[in-house]
UniProtKB/Swiss-Prot annotation:
It comes from Pseudotsuga menziesii (Douglas-fir). This is Unknown protein 8. The lineage of its organism: Eukaryota, Viridiplantae, Streptophyta, Embryophyta, Tracheophyta. It comes from the Eukaryota.
Length: 8
């Protein structure tokens, strides 16, 4: 996943 998505 992208970094922004992985934070979720």
């Amino acid at each position: 996943l992208q970094q922004a998505e992985a934070r979720r």
